[in-house]
Amino acid sequence: MNASSFSRRWICPAVAVFGGCALLAGCSSGHQTTSASNSTNTSVSNASIAQQGPQAGFMWSASEQTLRPILGVPGSSQFGAPMVTPGLYVAGGASTRSGVALLEDRAGQISLMSAATGQLQPLAGVHVSGAAQFVFSPSGLNAVIFVPGQGGALLLTGLGATDANSVQVQGLNSAAGLQSAAVSDLGQVVGASGTSPATLMLLTGNAAPVATLGGFGGIVFLPGGNALLAVDSANNAVELMPGNGAAPQIFTSNALRAPFAVAASQDGTTAVVANGGDDSVVRLDLTNAANQMRIPCTCKPDRLTPLAGNAVFALTGPGTSTAWAVDAAATVPHTLFIPAMVKQ
């Protein structure tokens, strides 16, 4: 699907404030929309998740097609009951930081959910064609939605609002199909196309190339600004692009082995990189390039999903076997396990 057809399918490529659904003349979502105020709550329980105690995070379970909370605190936690009826949604994602979740139903409708209360509201006029991926900014107040391989994306801002009508949506074009994307707390979006090499493109403002990587190993923004971390899997390197016109900083390490994902601490001082070449992650001190540490895991990392804490990230997802996480900010960085979830 090309960029223009993508934009028409999703929403007009301009900011729209839901409620009025103000689209530019000549633009159309191509769908009959449902007002958020008429939404049906399909969460499995009206009880507040917060009443179950502290949460270490929220994670989408692809095998069950539902969202689950991680109850407890890092190091002493377990998966809670499904937050939405399993099978009603085909894709989803959540921000532990903001307590916001986004879900895609079988018709491609995107809904906004408060992970704390379970309140679920469809976003009027926001549809996708295909199983979407949801990437949140560090604060969790912005998100970018894209379907891998399609040439376009949606930028959602104002996710901290309790009313879905206050969420703003902007359609973004990409000249090539996206395989990944990242969004900053300031609303800047960078998309990645291709694998070896991979091209990074700024999708907001004056769209332009950002960088070319020998191999794509992940991108993420640091909290609070537009500084971007980009991992080159072919050269086992991490590039920090300040976002202010200054020259990028390159981090290399013998511990980096075919990296495929990167995450940043909430204080912006630490990067965590997941290796594809062995069962480990690497902690990089962004203030001192010499301060590096390889953290082995008995698991095979397949993600870096932010959980509660400064630098706590899930390494594997919910399933019938033990899930794993890493606390990279601890005095002695270490991995943590989350017991296998119990089918509900």
What is the role of each PLM region?
Residues V44-G72, Q78-T96:
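Beta-strand-rich domains and repeat architectures in extracellular enzymes and scaffolds
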Residues E64-R68, G108-M113, Q150-T157, S196-L202, ...:
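Structural motif
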